[in-house]
């Protein structure tokens, strides 16, 4: 069994974004049922429905745990069903929630070496005592059997793999700070119980041949739903950057996500990490219809998929 | 006018704390009306009811803004009524929320040099572009007239002053890591519109003569309500540290906060930064009665005081 809960479906900033007065964010603030609020992207995954691994620690993690009974402590005075945290990148919206998980609670922190380097470079993350929360490097393309803090197998094996992406904004430097790289700075995650195969890829700058081959025939794929069109933030007047500049391919258009997945025979396709500028967030948008007709679901906070 | 909104009333970890299964946290999770949830300590203060300064950027800041209509954007596509953020320390629970305020939105970040040094030492805070969010050092005991980002006076003057405290846990080092110091690492904040005098002191290791003199006759004081008794976390089996070890004086007992304020003639006294182990959080606790009878209010998320 792969049991999966969407803790947050939105991209960095969430929906609504704190400083956005754009129409969609106003609808979310007004509790419009067609524009439900979404926190920042994260999932929890379990092989037994009892012990969970949080994939990406969003800034909203404290609220996300509060809203998710499966993640509430159940034993003793201090405990957690969260056995570990896996990071697919070092962006603010994937690591900030680690600061919520202090309080001397054992769990395992798993990330690739470039992401662990980013944490090492920020002493604030020493709030997680390394003797209690070990930092375990993940090697690209090496299957890694998840275990509970006591060593018991968790029933899931993950395989991290590099996807095209960019370094976090706060770590940009050098002559080409926005270069798209594929070095493990941004990863996708394959998850399997030995039978089913699920993927979590919240950020991806472009589809590649090897990625296409990897995903073909998968049972479940969560994929980068940041932007509907590459220039939507510019056109809406809410930002200066294209999706490509931010390291995200767009959902629509030639070479977009819908296009790229058309012949991949993935059983269940779910968009996640959806920016507040993306009309997919609105249940009554024509873009939502287009995505649905192409076989895509739009994730929402609390969505649960068991496969 | 000093207009003040409590964004969060709880100490670090909030109430309920993510990994606490103690009875009080279970009551909060069960929506017991006598144990309402509280987010991590922060206030917003305004001299005109329209432009706000957030004092301490808690990890819950995104949710706190969402719950506070006064802090919602009102103009254009991107804007905020938040003119600045003032930090009284460099703890995880006072700085993490800065990472929520990215998105190229101008405001001013004000803190003492030791706290700015802690931010400087953590490149993740470069997510706030210094050309858009200037970092302004506050000098101890120097009145500082708050201004809006366009330079307009905000109608409030703050004076930061050192209070006994300790360095953040993640920055502890040396032979006496928990030493109580009074060097500006932890500050209190005096706030005035020229007529009224309010104070915000969410962490204080002990009452001193100069602090007593400063607070005498104040209109409003928010004060460290972390623990009811110094050893309550040890006795409850939920922690190894006393309040003194964490840099917080306790509310009750000889030399405690109630005792220390007994003859200070403060018009309105409000406890804030209340730990989830503190029975003051429970409306039906005898300790709450004792505090009320001594003239203290217990702050809650959304509490608004205009003085």
UniProtKB/Swiss-Prot annotation, chains A, B:
GO BP term (any one): pyrroloquinoline quinone biosynthetic process
UniProtKB keywords: PQQ biosynthesis, Transport
Pathway noted in the entry: Cofactor biosynthesis; pyrroloquinoline quinone biosynthesis
Transport among keywords: yes
Lineage of the organism: Bacteria, Pseudomonadati, Pseudomonadota, Alphaproteobacteria, Acetobacterales
Highest taxon of source: Bacteria
Cited InterPro entries: Metallo-B-lactamas (IPR001279), PQQ_synth_PqqB (IPR011842), RibonucZ/Hydroxyglut_hydro (IPR036866)
Entry's family note: Belongs to the PqqB family.
Matches recorded under PANTHER family: COENZYME PQQ SYNTHESIS PROTEIN B, HYDROLASE C777.06C-RELATED-RELATED
Gene3D superfamilies: Ribonuclease Z/Hydroxyacylglutathione hydrolase-like
Keyword Transport: yes
Gene giving rise to this polypeptide: pqqB
Protein name in the entry: Coenzyme PQQ synthesis protein B
Protein's job: May be involved in the transport of PQQ or its precursor to the periplasm.
Organism, scientific name: Gluconacetobacter diazotrophicus (strain ATCC 49037 / DSM 5601 / CCUG 37298 / CIP 103539 / LMG 7603 / PAl5)
């Amino acid at each position: 069994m792969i049991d999966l809960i969407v803790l947050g479906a939105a991209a960095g900033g969430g929906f609504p974004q704190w400083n956005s007065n754009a129409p969609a964010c106003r609808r979310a603030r007004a509790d419009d049922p067609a524009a439900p609020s979404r926190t920042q992207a994260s999932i929890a995954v379990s092989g037994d429905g009892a012990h969970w691994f949080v994939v990406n620690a969003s800034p909203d993690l404290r609220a996300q745990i509060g809203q998710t009974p499966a993640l509430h402590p159940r034993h003793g005075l201090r405990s957690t069903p969260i056995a570990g945290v896996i990071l697919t990148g070092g962006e603010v919206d994937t690591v900030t929630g680690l600061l919520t998980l202090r309080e001397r609670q054992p769990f395992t922190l798993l990330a690739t070496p470039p992401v662990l380097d980013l944490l090492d470079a920020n002493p604030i993350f020493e709030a997680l005592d390394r003797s209690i929360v070990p930092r375990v490097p993940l090697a690209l393309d090496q299957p890694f059997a998840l275990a509970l803090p006591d060593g018991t197998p968790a029933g899931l094996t993950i395989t991290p793999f590099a996807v095209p992406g960019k370094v976090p904004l706060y770590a940009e430097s050098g002559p080409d700070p926005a270069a798209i790289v594929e070095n493990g700075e941004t990863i996708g995650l394959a998850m399997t119980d030995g039978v089913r195969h699920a993927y979590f890829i919240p950020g991806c700058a472009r589809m590649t041949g090897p990625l296409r081959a990897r995903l073909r025939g998968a049972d479940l794929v969560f994929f980068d739903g940041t932007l509907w069109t590459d220039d939507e933030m510019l056109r809406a007047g809410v930002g200066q950057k294209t999706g490509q500049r931010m390291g995200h391919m767009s959902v629509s258009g030639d070479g977009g996500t819908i296009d790229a997945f058309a012949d991949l025979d993935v059983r269940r396709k779910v968009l996640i990490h959806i920016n507040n500028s993306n009309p997919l967030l609105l249940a009554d948008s024509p873009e939502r219809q287009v995505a649905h007709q192409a076989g895509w679901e739009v994730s929402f906070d609390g969505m649960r998929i068991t496969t």
